[in-house]
Amino acid sequence: IKKITNNGRINHYSKQNITTTWGYFDHMKRGVLLMNIGTPDEPNVESVRTYLREFLLDPDVIDIPTPLRHLLVRGIILKTRPKKIAPRYQSIWMEEGSPLRVFTQKMTDAVEQNMDDTVCEVGMRYGNPSIRYGLERLKKSGVKEVLLAPLFPHHAQATTESSLKFAYKQMKEINWNPLTKELGHFPNNPNFIDPLVESIRPYLQEDSHLLFSYHGLPISHVKRSDKSGKHCQKVENCCGISLDANSMCYAHHCSLTTEAVSKKLGLSKVDWSMSYQSRLGPAKWLKPSTTETVQNLARNGIKKLVIVSPAFLADGLETLEELDIEIREEFLSEGGE
């Protein structure tokens, strides 16, 4: 975080007191709010329902007219999905609590230990400890200069934008106006790529295949990042070309990470694949899906599969359960080893 911040993006979501370089105001007490997506408090139906209600009613997540969003979420999703998801959380729950919360806190503690005279707090966009709670703790600690750090390497409306906008709203509500800076996206920053590569390398064998599985997004979210309206889904290999039109595109950022990692590992194109997981609802989402990709790889003779999820900086339901249990079983059932 400390290294990536030095090349970070300056505040795009608020015009208040923007600092251009971290540490410029060295005489002021500094703080970092590490923001992750969030998790239920407990692995039971009611806690999952409470979490999903807050998450799915966010217009940055399901961006349809408010009446339709409430009808969909309250009238359909919340009546059925919590019962299906609660057992999945139970299968990965730790003694200390939710894996995502536990690992995000450990990351926050490690960042604080490696940054001199800096207070670090966790802020979950949905659930606890909330972004507001983290900001209030920083304020009470006497912090005058704060870095808002969304833990999402790839920019998206539903993650980075939602977290930052909500953080500024909460800062206003608690009447706190510190000097601020944002940690922007960092899909191919060496300080992200290098340790990611080293975490993958020990698992690769001569005959193994590497699958990059990213959290999926609705196509409508991806298209909205193309301010020109002339590039996304209209140009061949639109995500593989770096232009101003896709500079804030989630799918393009995922491609940048995949390219950087595969290149540093010395992999040829036949040695790796890229897919998207965790689809929700009937809307068109980014393709190919991780489930279909894994099935096809196994059917085409791939026996040893390594899956990496660069979109998640802390393990949670999508990695520990969806990939390590569900997708693993899918691969084995299709003949994989």
Residue ranges and their predicted role:
Residues M28-E337:
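Active-site-proximal alpha-helix that buttresses catalytic centers in soluble enzyme cores
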Residues T5, F25-D26:
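General helical secondary-structure elements
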Residues K3-N6, N17:
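Polybasic, lysine-rich low-complexity intrinsically disordered segments
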